[in-house]
UniProtKB/Swiss-Prot annotation:
This is Phosphatidylglycerol--prolipoprotein diacylglyceryl transferase. A 1,2-diacyl-sn-glycero-3-phospho-(1'-sn-glycerol) binds at residue 230. The keyword Ubl conjugation does not apply. It comes from Rhodopirellula baltica (strain DSM 10527 / NCIMB 13988 / SH1). Belongs to the Lgt family. Its main location: membrane. The lineage of its organism: Bacteria, Pseudomonadati, Planctomycetota, Planctomycetia, Pirellulales. It is a multi-pass membrane protein. Signal peptide: none annotated. The gene is lgt. It is found in: Cell inner membrane. One of its GO terms (cellular component) is plasma membrane.
Length: 492
């Protein structure tokens, strides 16, 4: 069976531009490899500062009379050993290298920074809401590590499964390292939701925490995390939409970004309109083959003599890597472009010859972030409606128990449905996922349909079948949550 050749692009493109005036970068700043001739990570400055901090803590505990030196050492030993392993073994493996392969430093990514903000904001808000709900902030703090680890693994596994060919390397070790390189981005929100949800269920069952009520506590906070997370995608230059006209919902990325490279290989930035060559094999990474349908008169392709009806190979040219200073990462090198006809070079364009900015694409990251902010407010409004005091409930208890209420779990299910609808719509304007199962629907759209259907069925069951004043416990009994003796309900 023949398939159309698709464009495959090497990773390691950096930066993005919101407009011709405003620029954001994938790398916020670079922690240099060494300072004063001594490396910062590995056996270096960071390890020295860790040792000084541990000794200072032990000395402080001993002098204030609270703990003895041996007790203080035992308390901090586990943390110190783990931190030392990270600084000496893990972090050096994430250092970027120059064109000669020498380490130049550790990149602090905008993507990672926004993920950290997402974690802090969502957990902090959830802890506050849990305290108000009578569940206690500790219920969130105990749950958070499980959720984050499960979410991170789920998001990465989902992404690697979708794009496994991009991670294949000559050896198993190199392949596994590529799959584990989270500093390069590559997380799928749905995978994170699924992994985090499964891990959370395990933790909630273990601690006998009320699942429906804690879900109602958390779901608005998930959208806060989504808001920051999608801004991280914007910084990383991923999860963008298809081509569109310039406008308030459009973004433009600079040379070096993934979308810029895609538009080079598709011929758009060269002034070519065409269709892919049909073949059983995909072209090598960084190449595309196409039949020219038309050429813009004022374009680079027209200057190079490209004609309608020709079959061309367009390839990214990495030969300009040497232009990057040796104190900067090799990933900052901008590619040139080579255009070939029947294996003969038709034109060669240096990075300076090429457009410095890509054509507009839908800013799906911005759309998703705005929707997340709106859904956060909407869920709070729905929550207020669901928890209006009634004649059959104790007003004080209902006001205090801001989650659960007369319909525990409804708020969480509404959030699931809303995100499923959003994702289906966004996938229609995104271009980074192919149709699955013989349809035009992407894997995320299929998952969305399953989530929506399951949530609607569960919502109907919860709405029709839940007692307005109780929630079922893991053991099968009921615990009164409004107007009864127990303020904290048990879960499923």
């Amino acid at each position: 069976m023949e398939v159309a050749r698709t464009v495959r692009i090497p990773h390691a493109f950096d930066g993005l531009t919101l407009s011709r005036q405003a620029t954001m970068r994938r790398t916020l700043f670079l922690i240099p490899h060494e300072f004063a001739g001594w490396p910062i990570f590995g056996i270096g400055w960071a390890l020295l500062f860790l040792l000084i901090a541990v000794l200072a803590y032990v000395g402080w505990e001993s002098r204030r009379g609270g703990l003895g030196a041996s007790t203080a050492i035992r308390q901090i030993a586990g943390f110190a050993v783990m931190a030392a392993v990270i600084l000496v073994v893990v972090v050096p493996r994430t250092e970027l290298v120059n064109t000669l392969g020498d380490p130049v430093g550790v990149a602090v990514r905008g993507y990672g920074m926004f993920l950290m903000l997402a974690a802090i904001a969502s957990v902090g808000l959830a802890a506050w809401r849990a305290e108000r709900a009578g569940l206690g902030a500790d219920s969130i703090l105990q749950l958070a590590p499980w959720t984050f680890i499960g979410g991170l693994l789920g998001a990465r596994v989902f992404y690697v499964t979708q794009y496994y060919e991009d991670f294949l390397r000559p050896t198993w070790g190199e392949t596994l390292m590529a799959m584990a390189a989270l500093n390069q981005g590559g997380l799928v929100v749905y995978g994170g939701f699924i992994g985090g949800f499964i891990a959370s269920l395990i933790a909630l069952k273990r601690h006998q925490t009320p699942i429906w009520r804690i879900g109602d506590v958390i779901i608005p906070c998930v959208f806060v995390g989504l808001l920051f997370g999608r801004l991280g995608c914007l910084m990383n230059g991923c999860c963008y939409g298809g081509a569109c006209e310039a406008g308030p919902l459009a973004v433009q990325f600079p040379a070096g970004s993934q979308v810029h490279a895609e538009q080079l290989l598709s011929g758009e930035l060269l002034g070519i309109e065409g269709h892919p060559v049909v073949s059983d094999e995909e072209p090598p990474a960084g190449q595309s083959q196409m039949v020219v349908d038309s050429v813009r008169p004022d374009s680079l392709a027209n200057q190079a003599g490209v004609k309608k009806g020709e079959t061309l190979t367009i390839a990214l040219d990495p030969s300009y890597r040497d232009q990057v200073p040796l104190d900067r990462p090799a990933e900052e090198a901008l590619p040139g472009v080579v255009v070939l006809r029947d294996d003969e070079v038709v034109a060669r364009f240096s990075p300076r010859d090429l457009p410095s900015i890509a054509d507009p694409v839908w800013g799906t990251q911005i759309i998703s972030s705005v929707f997340a902010a709106i859904m956060f407010v909407v869920l709070l409004i729905v929550e207020r409606i669901l928890h209006r005091p009634s004649k059959q409930t104790d007003d004080a208890v209902t006001e205090r128990a801001i989650t659960g209420g007369r319909r525990p779990g409804v708020l969480m299910l509404v959030g699931f449905i809303a995100y499923g609808v959003l994702r289906i719509v966004l996938e229609w304007i995104r271009v980074d996922e192919k149709g699955q199962f013989g349809t035009s629907l992407s894997i995320s759209q299929w998952v969305s349909l399953v989530v929506i259907a399951a949530s609607l069925v569960t919502l109907f069951i919860r709405w029709r079948g839940v007692d307005s004043t109780s929630e079922q416990t893991p053991g099968g009994g009921n615990t009164n949550v409004v107007g009864g003796s127990d303020a904290a309900a048990a879960g499923l």
